[in-house]
Amino acid sequence: MAKYEILYIIRPNIEEEAKNALVARFDSILTDNGATIVESKAWEKRRLAYEIKDFREGLYHIVNVEANNDEALKEFDRLSKINGDILRHMIVKLDA
C-alpha cells in the first residue's frame, strides 16, 4: 500500500459545524473509494503567504492515507477543486 499525505486549507470564516461536516465528507470520499485513513486532524489557523480568494488566513487540515490505487486520490482532487470551502489542497506521496 502506498502512503499519501493530503493537506488542505479551509476558508477561515466557515462555521464549526459546517467545517466538521466538510471534513467528514472528504474523509468519506477517501474511504468510499478504497483508501484507509491513518490520521485526520485539524492542524491550526495560519496566515497565508499570499491572498487566496480574498482570504489572508486559512484553517489547515492534514490527512494521512494508505491506498492501493489512486482512485480515491483522484476523486478527492476532483471534488476539492470544485468545492468553494477548500481554498487549496496538496497531495504528496510519502516514501515507503
From Swiss-Prot:
BP-aspect Gene Ontology terms: translation
Annotated keywords: Ribonucleoprotein, Ribosomal protein, RNA-binding, rRNA-binding
InterPro entries for the chain: Ribosomal_bS6, Ribosomal_bS6_sf, Ribosomal_S6_plastid/chlpt, Transl_elong_EF1B/ribsomal_bS6
GO MF annotation terms: small ribosomal subunit rRNA binding; structural constituent of ribosome
Spans traversing the lipid bilayer: none
Keyword Membrane attributed: no
HAMAP family on file: Ribosomal_bS6
Family statement: Belongs to the bacterial ribosomal protein bS6 family.
Protein name per its UniProtKB record: Small ribosomal subunit protein bS6
